[in-house]
Amino acid sequence: MISFAEGLLYGILEEAFPGDLAHCIGDTSEIEVHLEKAINDFKIETFDSIKSGIKEIGIIVQAIPSLLKDCKIEENDLKKLAEMAVIFTHPLTLALRVGKNILVNGVDIYDKISKGLTLYQSADYNGSGRQFGMALAEVFLKTSS
């Protein structure tokens, strides 16, 4: 799942991770559990299942900073991850932010989620992570109108 994590970071941070995650990232079993749940949610393709899948990917985002503790990561990138992770600790804020950005601000993440799912099913985990990361960045890092 290192490849997925690299892709997810790339999608969120809009740049490749500087270095080799395989040599500095910790145990990825938590990522694997939540990723499988997210993939199953995304396959259902309803608004609620997409929200649930985003929540599962968010749990992965919350876990990433502790997994990266031995990695060299820029302060600004860590700040983006922390900002996004905080939202996932407040379920009401999460639901409001996702709903508002998808419905009010017109954030269209369906194509990214769909492409991420297709890439995951074809074992392109890096590409899949990148698509999910870009979808998260659209929802959580997009400036509200």
Regions found by a protein language model. Give the residues of each.
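Mature extracellular/luminal domains of secreted and GPI-anchored eukaryotic proteins, especially small
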Residues: 1-145
